């Protein structure tokens, strides 16, 4: 369960379209502490960490999540609130 307290912020570094889904690479000071399959709140949306590479981690949002949240507007440089 998330506390609602933002732990840190990240920056969208890369956006990859996969059909109607989007994959995001997020750079943050806590990325190297994350683990694959860990749930992390990204600006209020709970997403599963798919890969960690140094100070970056990868997540994917499906089309419905992109429609019902602000993730559809994320682009490189967008700030992301992170909560574990």
Enumerate the language-model features and the residues they cover.
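Conserved loop->alpha-helix
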Residues: 1-84
């Amino acid at each position: 369960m998330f506390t609602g307290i933002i732990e840190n912020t990240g920056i969208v570094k890369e956006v990859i379209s996969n059909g109607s889904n989007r994959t995001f690479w997020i750079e943050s000071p806590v990325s190297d502490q994350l683990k694959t399959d860990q749930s992390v709140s990204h600006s209020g949306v709970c997403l599963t960490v798919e890969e960690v590479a140094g100070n970056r981690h990868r997540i994917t949002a499906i089309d419905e999540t992109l429609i019902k949240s602000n993730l559809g507007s994320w682009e490189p440089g967008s700030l992301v609130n992170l909560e574990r």
